[in-house]
Amino acid sequence: MNREHKIRGYRNMLGLTQEKLGEELGISKQSYYNKETGKTQFSDKEKLKIKNLLIPLFPEITIEDIFF
């Protein structure tokens, strides 16, 4: 599975739209879209926030699992 599909899959598991996850990260829907599709990179802070949102579903998940 490519990176884009992995990140979208995790977002869907959280039940969040691109707009809502963007809000969680403090960025616009367009900025989030650009990051999810690989046009721009997630910052380390954003990666950590996404990981922390996923911890309740996947207690052992790592940033590497999500983004690489």
Q: Positions of the model-derived regions?
A:
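A short, Lys/Arg-rich alpha-helix, primarily the initiator
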Residues: 1-13, 61
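Short, solvent-exposed alpha-helical "recognition" segments
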Residues: 39-44
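The alpha-helix within a helix-turn-helix
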Residues: 11, 22, 51
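Residues within the helices of the helix-turn-helix
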Residues: 8, 19, 64
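DNA major-groove recognition helix of helix-turn-helix/homeodomain DNA-binding modules
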Residues: 45-61
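Short alpha-helical DNA-recognition segment
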Residues: 15-34
